């Protein structure tokens, strides 16, 4: 059974190199975990893929440790309980800051350099003519006052921070401009389910979660808007891993090739086609957006 670290917070991928005691003292373990941004089934598949692939590539034991939420993932890497983590853009910045400069982004999926959020609406609401596909959030603004709306997790880049940023820029008040005020779900899967089931009229979520959903689910949750692009998920490594180990981990990700059968489980688990090397400076725009929302009193 995989261990679960419970700390009041959201989810993401993390890993730490820990020396074992006793007979296993010379057999270090790379402990890995991640933000729970999707369903438990998807996180379990990710855990199995990481343990298997990184274990073989690095020639060592790899253990995936579940984090109960996003904050727990950030707390683990910040307190040196793990050394490597797969984060969203916002939690990635949080993770680097939590390590007081002793951590950096080392890899990202190629598509994360051009990521986006989808706004979706319940089929019945669309069929009733209350909302439909729009070319801008300004066009969506007058319709939202009579509709319920949900974001994803509070620290989700694609499920909350960036869509809130774009909605604010369009002049949408997330309290008075939405029926009942904007709500939040724990992850993207829950957002999609809530909208598809009609428990919420409109929602914002990670586009890959929507694109990968069943046709039946997408029939009940209609895509009505696609945001401009931004940078998102990233692999963050603590400097305590050492340059040699960090280079090996980075290479293990950037060498993943969809044409190789042995790499498909890993790529599928990450919903990725390719990984590329990354630098922390690429996430400056995320820092700027977070600061802007904080300055406006919309984010703590």
Residues covered by each model-derived region:
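A local structural motif
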Residues: 55-66, 81, 146-148, 170-184, ...
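Periplasmic-binding protein-like
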Residues: 35-36, 109-118, 215-253, 257, ...
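Short helix-initiation/N-cap motifs at beta->coil->alpha
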Residues: 64-75, 88-90, 174-193, 229-231
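C-terminal motif of bacterial Sec signal peptides marking the signal peptidase cleavage site
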Residues: 17-19
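Bacterial signal peptide processing site
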Residues: 21-23
């Amino acid at each position: 059974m995989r261990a679960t670290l419970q700390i009041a917070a959201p989810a993401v991928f993390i890993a730490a190199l820990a020396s074992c005691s006793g007979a296993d003292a010379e057999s270090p373990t790379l402990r890995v975990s991640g933000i729970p941004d999707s369903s438990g089934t998807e996180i379990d598949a990710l855990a199995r893929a990481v343990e298997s692939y990184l274990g073989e590539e690095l020639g060592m034991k790899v253990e995936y440790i579940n984090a109960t939420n996003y904050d727990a993932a950030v707390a683990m890497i910040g307190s040196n309980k793990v050394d490597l983590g797969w984060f969203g853009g916002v939690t990635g910045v949080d993770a680097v800051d939590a390590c007081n400069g002793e951590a950096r982004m080392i890899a990202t999926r190629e598509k994360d350099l051009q990521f986006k959020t989808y706004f979706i609406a319940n089929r019945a609401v669309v069929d009733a003519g209350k909302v439909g596909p729009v070319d801008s959030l300004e066009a969506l603004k007058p319709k939202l006052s009579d509709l319920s709306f949900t974001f994803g997790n509070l620290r989700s880049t694609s499920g909350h921070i960036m869509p809130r940023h774009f909605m604010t820029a369009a002049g949408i008040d997330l309290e008075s401009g939405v029926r009942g005020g904007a709500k939040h779900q724990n992850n993207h899967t829950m957002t999609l389910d809530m909208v598809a089931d009609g428990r919420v009229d409109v929602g914002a979520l990670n586009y890959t979660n929507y694109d990968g959903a069943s046709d039946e689910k997408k029939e009940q949750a209609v895509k009505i808007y696609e945001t401009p692009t931004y940078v998102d998920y990233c692999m963050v490594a603590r400097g305590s891993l050492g340059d040699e180990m960090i280079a090996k981990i980075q290479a293990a990700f950037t060498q993943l090739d969809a044409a190789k059968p042995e790499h498909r489980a890993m790529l599928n688990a990450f919903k990725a086609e390719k990984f590329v090397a990354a630098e922390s400076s690429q996430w400056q725009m995320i820092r700027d957006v977070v600061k802007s929302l904080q300055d406006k009193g919309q984010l703590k």
